[in-house]
Structure formats: structure tokens, C-alpha cells
């Protein structure tokens, strides 16, 4: 407005005519104004902002510029001497008005100045722009590769004697790197493009232990597709020293797993971690082909823990239909295997979270015996009758479950349903009594 106030009317008209007609044109002008010496770093910063899993703080984003992606060793390395003194000003200078810095003095967050900036940078429209603008088009795979590589360059500078707070102080990006680098590396084919992963997973170097100390990814993931948790299934937690092979399998890094099998074959059959074996760790992440490779080399897909629950028990508990099929059809796991209280996977499917009729149906279709009894004599039909699971009970009786069998207290499923006043269940069971 100050410019317009000092212009003659004809100049004002000409100024207005030269204004960008769209947001795209506005952003293109901003990109063209980025100085040549800072173009590469601006592009990397924008790439990282696009794919960051959580908002990045000023010091975290600025740390990426201290990574030499063209190090003579061929592996990107952190160069502490490259760190900016005035990080906020340097970021704003590099990325111009495309970014904004918000938050308190204790936590300054870098974000795009408008949501449309991210949409513009990743848009196919930008991919067809002139060469000076095309360099800023952001494809997701290269962007994830840049951020994963930056994170890895931090992690291979850690050692296992440094406390978490000191580590984070040494590198502001250490916390983010430890927690999220795997998720960036898992995007499409990024893991195969990262340089230096072998160093992080080398058991003879301190970096692997330091990473696990800073953030341990070996925890059952909090969504339904994960098929077991130790607290409910009884599998032994971390019974043994963690191995890089186990973690590589957990991450689904196929090339790295194959290298580690050759270099450290003693780790293939080792028992450790939440999932106990590398093969089960791979299965937990749906890395089925990798699990098969590990299984062929001697890693069990059916370890048993302190309560003798099998992997199939856990899959049934979580109603994980795909995993049940893989374990039974591909690996021949005993579908009627019992734990130390006599529970089969079918019992677990009825007790599970969630308890799915489809899981019960699948187990029965693949040969689960509906007459198997717990140590107290209870059958799956006793369980369904007590809980009022009409659909489950119907499936069980259709597959031959007896309504007359007694538990150790002499109760039939009908007795149990009567005691719980399950009227609809009583009607169903009466209809299937022996004539």
C-alpha cells in the first residue's frame, strides 16, 4: 500500500495489472526470487516440511542444513560447523514467504505460510512448469529419502553411553530422528536408497544400542492390525538381548535382513523382543515375504512364551483374519494347539479384542475343533453361552459343537445360558439339543 500511495494513477493501474492472477503465479514468483546460492537448501527444507510426520521446530529443521549430502565418503554426514547462528532468520531467508515461524520462545515451529503452499509444491501442475520452477516440485519418495538420510546421519553419531538429554542437546534432531526415521525409510522404496544403514545395524558398533536407548520401536503398535500384545497373550517380553536382525525384520528392511542373515547367522534363531523372533516381528508388520525368508533360514513363526500362547492364539485374539490364514495355510501351525490352561485359538477368538464372528468362522473352516475343553472343562460354546454371543454360538453349533457337553462343574452350555438369563441363547441351544 505504501508503494501505491507514492504512485501516479497510471502507475497504480500498471502495478495492479502486474499482480499475480492466481496463487500458483504468486508462489512461482516467490520461488523465482530465491537466491541461487540457497536454492538447494531451500528445496531440501521444503521437502522436509512436506513429509515431516510431526511439525518441526526451528532448530530441528535448521539441523538438516548441517548435513553434507555430498560428503566425499559417499555417505551423507552431519557437519556441526555448518550450523547457522541465527536459525530463524536463515530459514526465512532461504524459503522466503513460503514458510512462517509460530509458537512460543521455548518452542518455535516452522510451518507453511498457507496450506495451499504444500498443495502447490506437490501438485502435478508444478511438474510441468519451466525449468527454474520445476526444481522445486516435490515428489514424496525423494522427500522422504532426504529426511530419512538426514535422520540417519544423526543416529550414526550417537553412542550408547550418552544420556537422552545430552544426546538431544548434542543434536536437536536426535529425538525426531530416533522416533521417526523408520517411518520415512518405510515409504515406498526409500530404504533401498538410503546410504549408511549398515552402520546403524552393525552389532559391533555403538550406534544401534544408542538408537534403541533414545527410542525403542519394539512395542506392539496401537492399532487393530497388530495381532498380539504381551499383556494379554502371555508372550515373554524381551527375553534376550535385542539384535539388529530382529529390528531390521520389524522394520521390513529386506535387503538389510538378507545381509545380516549372512553376517550374523546366530541371530536368526535368537529369542528376543516383544515378538520373540525375527520372523514373527516381520509378520507383525505384514512383511510376509521377508518372514518367509527368515523362516527358511531358521527363525520360528510360532514361538511360545511363559503362558504357552502361540502366535496363532494372538492372531485369533485380535481377529486378525489374514494372519490366521498365513499361519495355518502357509506355515502349517497347529490350529488346535493349547496353552497352559487348555485354551485353543478358537477359545481366544471368542475372548478377543474384538471378538469377531468371522474369526470364529475362519478357524472352524480350517479345522478348529469346537469341542476342545479348557482345564475347567469349558468349551467355546460354554464361553459364547456365558457372554450371550448369539452369532458365535450359532456358528459353533452349525459346525457340530455339542450343547450337551459338561464342564467340570457339570454345567452344559444351556445351564450356563440359563444361569446368565440369556433368553435368546437358551432358545437357540434348545433348538439344537439331541432329539
What are these regions (language model features)?
Residues 235-245, 270-280, 304-311, 338-344, ...:
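Ankyrin-repeat boundary/"N-cap" motif
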Residues 406-435:
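Leucine-rich solenoid repeat scaffolds
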Residues 37, 56, 161, 191, ...:
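Alpha-solenoid repeat scaffolds
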Residues 247-252, 281-287, 314-320, 348-356, ...:
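Ankyrin repeat A-helix N-terminal signature
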Residues 1-270, 277-296:
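Leucine/isoleucine-rich amphipathic helices and adjacent mixed helix/strand linkers
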Residues 255-256, 289-290, 322-323, 358-359, ...:
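Conserved ankyrin/ankyrin-like repeat signature
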Residues 259-267, 292-300, 325-334, 361-369, ...:
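Ankyrin repeat domain, specifically the short helix-to-loop turn at the C-terminus of the second helix
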Amino acid at each position: 500500500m505504501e508503494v501505491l500511495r507514492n504512485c501516479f494513477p497510471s502507475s497504480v493501474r500498471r502495478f495492479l495489472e502486474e499482480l499475480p492472477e492466481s496463487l500458483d503465479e504468486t508462489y512461482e514468483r516467490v520461488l523465482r526470487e530465491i537466491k541461487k546460492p540457497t536454492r538447494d537448501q531451500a528445496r531440501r527444507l521444503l521437502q522436509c516440511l512436506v513429509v515431516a510426520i510431526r511439525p518441526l521446530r526451528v532448530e530441528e529443521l535448521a539441523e538438516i542444513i548441517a548435513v553434507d549430502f555430498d560428503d566425499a565418503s559417499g555417505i551423507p554426514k552431519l557437519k556441526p560447523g555448518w550450523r547457522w547462528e541465527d536459525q530463524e532468520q536463515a530459514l526465512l531467508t532461504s524459503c522466503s514467504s513460503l514458510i512462517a515461524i509460530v509458537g512460543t520462545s521455548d518452542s518455535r515451529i516452522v510451518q507453511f505460510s498457507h496450506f495451499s503452499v504444500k498443495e502447490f509444491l506437490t501438485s502435478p501442475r508444478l511438474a510441468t512448469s519451466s525449468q527454474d520452477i520445476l526444481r522445486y516440485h516435490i515428489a514424496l519418495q525423494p522427500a522422504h529419502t532426504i529426511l530419512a538420510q538426514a535422520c540417519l546421519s544423526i543416529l550414526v553419531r550417537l553412542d550408547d553411553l550418552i544420556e537422552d538429554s545430552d544426546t538431544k542437546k548434542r543434536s536437536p534432531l536426535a529425538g525426531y530422528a530416533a522416533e521417526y526415521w523408520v517411518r520415512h525409510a518405510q515409504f515406498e522404496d526409500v530404504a533401498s536408497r538410503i546410504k549408511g544403514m549398515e552402520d546403524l545395524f552393525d552389532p559391533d558398533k555403538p550406534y544401534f544400542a544408542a538408537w534403541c536407548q533414545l527410542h525403542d520401536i519394539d512395542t506392539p503398535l496401537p492399532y487393530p492390525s497388530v495381532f498380539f500384545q504381551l499383556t494379554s497373550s502371555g508372550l515373554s517380553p524381551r527375553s534376550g538381548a535385542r539384535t539388529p536382525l530382529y529390528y531390521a525384520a520389524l522394520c521390513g528392511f529386506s535387503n538389510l535382513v538378507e545381509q545380516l542373515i549372512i553376517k550374523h547367522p546366530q541371530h536368526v534363531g535368537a529369542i528376543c523382543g516383544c515378538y520373540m523372533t525375527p520372523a514373527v516381528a516381520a509378520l507383525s508388520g505384514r512383511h510376509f515375504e521377508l518372514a518367509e525368508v527368515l523362516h527358511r533360514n531358521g527363525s520360528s513363526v510360532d514361538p511360545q512364551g511363559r503362558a504357552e500362547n502361540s502366535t496363532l492364539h494372538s492372531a485369533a485374539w485380535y481377529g486378525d483374519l489374514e494372519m490366521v490364514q498365513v499361519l495355518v495355510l502357509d506355515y502349517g501351525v497347529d490350529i488346535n494347539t493349547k496353552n497352559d490352561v487348555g485354551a485353543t485359538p478358537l477359545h481366544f477368538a471368542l475372548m478377543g479384542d474384538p471378538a469377531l464372528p468371522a474369526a470364529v468362522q475362519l478357524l472352524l473352516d480350517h479345522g478348529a475343533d469346537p469341542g476342545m475343553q479348557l482345564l475347567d472343562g469349558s468349551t467355546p460354546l460354554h464361553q459364547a453361552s456365558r457372554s450371550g454371543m448369539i452369532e458365535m454360538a450359532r456358528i459353533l453349533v452349525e459346525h457340530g459343537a455339542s450343547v450337551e457337553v459338561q464342564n467340570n462343574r457339570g454345567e452344559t452350555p444351556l445351564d450356563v445360558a440359563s444361569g446368565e438369563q440369556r433368553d435368546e441363547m437358551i432358545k437357540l441351544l434348545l433348538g439344537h439339543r439331541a432329539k
